[in-house]
UniProtKB/Swiss-Prot annotation:
It comes from the Eukaryota. Pfam families: Zein (PF01559). InterPro entries: Zein (IPR002530), Zein-alpha (IPR051903). The gene is ZMPMS2. This is Zein-alpha PMS2. Belongs to the zein family.
Amino acid sequence: MAAKIFCFLMLLGLSASVATATIFPQCSQAPIASLLPPYLSPAVSSMCENPIVQPYRIQQAIATGILPLSPLFLQQPSALLQQLPLVHLVAQNIRAQQLQQLVLANLAAYSQQHQFLPFNQLAALNSAAYLQQQLPFSQLVAAYPRQFLPFNQLAALNSAAYLQQQQLLPFSQLADVSPAAFLTQQQLLPFYLHAMPNAGTLLQLQQLLPFNQLALTNSTVFYQQPIIGGALF
């Protein structure tokens, strides 16, 4: 009988202790957190937590930071599509400013390029004809570089006179027959460019020069005879 009473009291004490006890799971951070002082930073507190709990807290922090930004991510494609025309306009303005700066920096080269535009148009329309036209002169320049030096200086000093001279060069057949006579003829042309604004008159003079043997033998005496020039005028 005494044993039964003792067992009954034991069961009653166990039930009372179970009803009033607080269970702490293994993965809970409450025991450790209760021991930490309140003035520690959250970073130090997170380092002192249970290692099992740390990944869950990191995931919770990431989710907390991403969820408020989710409407922005949903609206971002439409905002980018609305900003594309503005981006293209800004890019075009930047290109235009760069071209203006390039033109202002190289104004002389830009003006010379506009003066050489007829030859560039010929090269763009018919590249074969342009190459055939330039081939005899390039061969002559390669064969006689020193004799073509005055023409390079003329191009640097007076581009308009140089262009007039270059426009008349393809009509001269003397370059294919006699390069030496052609070079002599070209050396005489700069002296007539300033007095003959008419290209047709200069072309007629070019056609008459090969028949004048005095120009090929003695250019000084030839300069003193304005017979051909006066007859043409």
